[in-house]
Amino acid sequence: CSSDLTQKPILDEEGHMILREEYYLDGLNCDPFSFASECQELNSYYHKNKNFNEIKSHHYIISFDPKDRDECGLTGERAQQLGLTFAKKNFPGHQALVCTHTDGHNESGNIHVHIVINSLRKYDIPQEPYMEFDCEAKAGYKHHLSTAYLTHLKQEVIDMCKKKDYIRLICSLLLKEKSQKKNIGHNAGDRKSSMN
């Protein structure tokens, strides 16, 4: 595993990579342990994401305040279920990894859910109101994050948390668009959209 902020591996005192103490991992439309190869197969099938500088995946983070754990009873397992429900509803037809861990950055204790989707849709879905183009609902086309889509995602997170009384949600769904080998976006780093 790696630190969320630096993306550097977490190492033990001997320099060996270690897993986080508590994490949950699921795949949608893929096996979580073969996500990368399954995405590459789909990309090859549709002849997409062949160039180095193309965006291969999108990374969303739903982060909860530590008080949601302490005062509202949020657990890593419950956050994972919320993340899975959110991903199924908001990224249908995409291959996705949903991973939750409970230690937060620098062991802050804030539970957060990572959702990483293949930039290419695997299955056709019904057209959604936030989609700008008809092709966005079709298999083989790339994920397009419009202003309307981002607004929709923000509201979905807020509604999900209000429904469960996680009112202290740190409302920051971060978007990281990554290529396989380097980050692409603003300031030569990750492109992020804050949900505040």
Language model features with spans:
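N-terminal nicking endonuclease/strand-transfer module with a His-rich metal-binding environment
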Residues: C1-N196
